[in-house]
A protein has these predicted regions:
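A conserved cap/lid and substrate-binding interface adjacent to the catalytic center
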Residues: 24, 33-164, 180-188, 193-207
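Helix N-terminus capping/helix-initiation residues
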Residues: 3-4, 37, 125, 257
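A broad, low-specificity signal marking well-ordered, structured residues that form hydrophobic/aromatic
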Residues: 13, 61, 76, 249-250
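N-terminal low-complexity, Ser/Thr- and acidic-residue-enriched intrinsically disordered segments
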Residues: 1-33
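Serine hydrolase/lipase
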Residues: 75, 150-155, 159-164, 180-268
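Solvent-exposed, charged interface segments at domain starts and junctions
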Residues: 1-8, 71-73, 163-167
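Glycine-rich nucleophile elbow surrounding the catalytic serine of serine-hydrolase chemistry
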Residues: 166-179
Length: 268
């Protein structure tokens, strides 16, 4: 049974959509009043960019913390947005293709900065979601989560905080990975037209699974040898460790959405 909180399913979905424009106090109040006919409990909005998180990786997320000591309210809604990009940036690179090629050949390790500047999410779609070869945005998501927890705890409320998570598209991939690498932190998770988790990202980011795989196969998870292990060989390990999370997550999918119909090679 889904955990009931201050926000219902419709408001959570609307806030996830509005996150792309940057959530404001006015937006949260507007949606709440339209749904419930009254002002929401006191709340604070925490933005990842205000904490200087995601400046290099392109990660962008928001948390809304509702709190009222008298009513025993202490709820946190973490929201992860999906892919954003500026295709004109690629056009500019095309016009300077020779200069771009020289920069890349001199510093191939700086591919994201050279080719994907301003399009970090598209880099993440390829190298994190598809290949599982980069975890920069996932790590920044974890940093953001830790900062949010710290800010919530600083209020010293007597009621234990309850954490919810909503995520769309690319954010769905990261949100699910955040959920399974955060123990029992998140009580209820909604994902909308999500990109699936990547098997190799989970192995690399989940401490217990990482150790199990490294011990069983005699490899280091961060090395390229991990790709010698077929995803099908890893599924049973992941199922055993992560099966309990299934009851916490709800998938909202539009069957006409392109992402929903894609079959990714390393998906979990």
């Amino acid at each position: 049974m889904k955990q009931k909180g201050v926000l219902g399913e419709l408001v959570r979905a609307r806030l996830t959509s509005a996150e792309y424009d940057g959530l404001t106090k006015e937006t949260v109040e507007k949606f709440y009043i339209e749904e419930y006919g009254q002002l929401p409990p006191p709340f604070e909005i925490i933005h990842s960019d205000k904490l200087q998180i995601g400046e290099e990786s392109g990660f962008n997320g928001t948390a809304v913390h509702f709190f009222d000591e008298n009513q025993g309210i202490n709820e946190v809604y973490v929201i992860n947005r999906g892919t954003e990009g500026d295709l004109s940036k690629f056009a500019e690179l095309g016009e300077k293709w020779l200069e771009t090629l020289k920069k890349y050949k001199q510093n191939p390790e700086n591919l994201r900065e050279i080719v994907f500047s301003g399009n970090e999410d598209i880099y993440t779609d390829a190298y994190e979601v598809l290949l599982g070869d980069d975890q920069s945005q996932i790590r920044d998501n974890q940093k953001f989560k830790n900062e949010v927890i710290q800010k919530v705890n600083e209020k010293n409320l007597s009621t234990k905080p309850v954490f919810f998570l909503d995520a769309h598209s690319l954010g769905g991939n990261q949100g699910q990975t955040l959920m399974v690498t955060s123990g029992d932190l998140f009580t209820d998770v909604n994902v909308y037209n999500d990109a699936p988790m990547n098997v190799y990202n989970i192995v690399r980011m989940h401490d217990k699974i990482r150790k199990t795989v490294e011990d069983k196969y005699g490899i280091l998870a961060d090395e390229h040898d991990i790709y010698k292990i077929k995803p099908s060989e890893l599924y049973s390990i992941l199922d055993t460790e992560l099966g309990s999370y299934a009851s916490k997550i709800t998938y909202y999918r539009n069957e006409e959405d392109l992402l929903t119909n894609l079959t990714l090679p390393y998906a979990y």
